[in-house]
Amino acid sequence: MREPKPQEDLQAIIDDIYRELTPRLGEGKVADYIPQLARVDARHFGMAIVTTGGEVYRVGDAEMPFSIQSISKVFTLTLALGKHGENIWNRVGREPSGSAFNSIVQLEHEGGKPRNPFINAGAIRISDLILAGHTPKELIGEIVRFVRYLADDENIVIDHEVARSETATGYRNIALANFMRSFGRLDHPVEHVLGVYFHHCALAMTCSQLAKAGLFLAAGGTNPLTGHSVVSRQRARRINALMLTCGHYDGSGDFAYRVGLPGKSGVGGGIMAVAPGKASIAVWSPGLNDYGNSLLGSLALEMLAARTGWSVFGP
């Protein structure tokens, strides 16, 4: 890829990235353990950038909705921190797991307390925490409204076919929830907690919507497009820190090394990344690498960081 020019236009950069990756579209393996996701064409690719100054840049399939899956865990964590504050860390840790996102081994070794809120067990525990005082249906509605508020877009919905598909085949997540319940780590019935979890993972968003929803994390906790204050500057910084260290499962270290941005991936092929003080980025390419993260999405973000100098570790 050619060297960046001073003040190079972001649209030109992502156009170049898309052009360079086009011959590789379809690489990676689509998640096949969720039947609805297995049907997605691996050749899709979309990318959107929303800057803190309000500029929006798009390329490829940036306006095509996809299942955000584990990216939704950033939003439920934000809700949990708003409801329970720092007390949530008594129930879930803040350390990278070094294990697969759906591993049960570490959970047993550590008494049913999940390592962090971004692995499946941790996100299930977060769903349990924010379920307090709600029925599952009420909480699912609150999560959807919150994400719409973040993105300033009322068109964001849950893909109920994906939710049903996950509910019917999510045996490992059912096992994780029951395992935590056996340790006294869940406060609500397993089926209620998983109902919330499966539905928030089934949120369908475009790259443009997702980049807008994550913009508060790039701008010190306030969405500069809407003026909505979401979290404090300190809390935004801490959520970004967790995304950097834990946002890509057992591939988090590799992503930090190659990209150097806080980010959260999902097995639907999406990644939401944050360049603090500069922009929020969303990329989607369904083919996954061995860690369960988007293969070309990760590469696109690596290229973007190299061209812009946006890595938090320096240009």
Curated annotation (Swiss-Prot):
GO terms for biological process: glutamate biosynthetic process; glutamine catabolic process. GO terms for molecular function: glutaminase activity. The keyword Hydrolase applies. It comes from the Bacteria. Its EC number is 3.5.1.2. Gene3D superfamilies: DD-peptidase/beta-lactamase superfamily. The keyword Hydrolase applies. It catalyses: L-glutamine + H2O = L-glutamate + NH4(+). Substrate binds at residues 70, 120, 166, 173, 197, 249, 267. SUPFAM superfamilies: beta-lactamase/transpeptidase-like. Keywords: Hydrolase. InterPro entries: Beta-lactam/transpept-like, Glutaminase. Belongs to the glutaminase family. Homotetramer. NCBIfam families: Gln_ase (TIGR03814), PRK00971.1-1 (NF002132), PRK00971.1-2 (NF002133). This is Glutaminase. It comes from Rhizobium meliloti (strain 1021) (Ensifer meliloti).
